[in-house]
Structure formats: C-alpha cells, structure tokens
Amino acid sequence: MLCKKCMKELTTFNTYPSDRRYCIACGTEHSTYISERRKTLTSLREMNLESKIIQTKYLIRCAVIEFGLDKVYISYSGGKDSTVLSHIAKSMYPDILHLFANTTNEYPETIQHIKWEKEENGTNIITVLPIDAKGDTWTFKKVVETYGYPMFSKRVANAIRTYQHALSERTKQNSQDYLDRNFKKYEKYKELPISDKCCDKLKKEPLRRKAKQLGLECAILGILASESYQREKDWLEYGCNVFHERKDNQSRPLSFWNDKDILEYIERYDVKIPKLYDMGYSRNGCMYCGFGVHL
C-alpha cells in the first residue's frame, strides 16, 4: 500500500497510526490541515443567517462562472434543504435547471411537492427515473433482492458489503478488522443481506447519466456537513466547491448551514415545503430506507 500523498510505500514502521492512508510525515501534515479546516467550519457555522445567505450566493455564482449557467444544475430532492437551496438559486437565476431523481421509493407528499414546483411555481425541473445504461428499470425491491437492504448507515452498510464480497481472504480479514475497529456492535449483522448500493442504483447513477446526456458539468447540492460524519469529513477535505478535483464537480453551498438556519430561512421567506414535515417527519428521503434506524 502506498501513501495517499507522497506515494511512498507504507510499512509497519512508517504508517501514520491515526490514518493508515498516509506515511508519518504526510499524516502529520494532513492532520494539521484538517485541524485548521475544522476551525474554519466552526467560524462559518457561527455566522448569522444573512451572512450565510451571502456566502451561499457567492458559492453558487462561482459554480455558474466556472461552468456556465447551461452547464450547472440543482440536484433537487424536494426536501426542505434542497428547497431552500432552490429558492436562493432561483433568486439569482430564475430558470436554473433542477434534476429530481424519482427513486420510485418517494413519499407521496414529495411527489406532490415536485408537481407543485413544476406546474405552479415555475421551477425548471426534469424528473429522472432509475433506468440503467442497458435500459433496465430499477426499483427498491430489485435493489434489495440484488444487493441487500440499506440498514444503519451508509458507512456501516458499506463495511458489511465489503466484507461479504471480499475476493480474497486477506481482503476479508481486513474488512473484518475494519468492522471490529469501527462498528463492533453491528458485527452480528455481517452475514445478513445488507448493502449501501440502493442510493447508487436509484439516484446517483441515473442522475450522472442524465447530466452527461444533457452536457451538464456541475451539480449544486443542498447538503449540510452537520448531517453525517461522512459529509463533515468530506467538507474538511474539500470544502464547499469541489471543481476539477474528483470524478464529479460539485458545489455544496449550504454545507456550513445547520437545521436551525434552514427552518429560519423557510419562516423568514415563507418557503413552501412538502406537507411531510407537518406530519412530524424531519427529513423526506426514501420511504423504506433503513439508514438511521440505529439512532
């Protein structure tokens, strides 16, 4: 295995103990960088709502300047976070394109809201269905039967799937060690049909194909770093706007917002969100998703 940064071969003696992707020198440098990034994220989170709106508009504008208005799109879920993002983006670019991935596992209230946005609120939305490159339609049932059920969290489900599908004994043992270190309490579920592939098959892959088909180059997402460990980690590594660094160009201009900011914005600007939230739900997501059941 090679150091992620300097590509030096990693051994028992030169591997950084807290992050085994790095040698000691690079790991120490990276740790310092992440520590400074964490301070930056804290400062951004402490800003008032008006300042956050200004910063969010700046980040959206950067994406449009970098790629062109006809090459960017709002990845729209119909939830309150992406609806706030849409409201801000449309105040700048009224006709900005929205792509909505209908996973076939949506709440009826979400579908109703999408219909309202398109037909009554004038939002430029294209609905994307989960059809793969071969033209086959995927459903939640098909994903579960083929790969397994989405349970606990994406990290846990991914760890279990990696363990189950290891191609060598060494990989299987490494996966077992990873489960032991990070998810000991879920080890008893490691032989059950659990996977993190659901979102890939029903949402991410169809959106990527549609974006490529339309010649789009950058997704603007309404995700918050506070929503999960992985999203915060991702922000610490890359920040809000990630251009020309990874497989997909992304702008995540709400990353430093929190749920309180979202609710305050909705109230201040009288933003319409799905009736789902009036029924006691805190998120929209997919109806039968098992991520979060451990919380």
Regions found by a protein language model. Name each.
Residues 12-21, 278-281:
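Short linker/helix segments within small regulatory modules
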Residues 10-11, 30, 105, 293:
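Cys/His-rich microdomains that often coordinate metals
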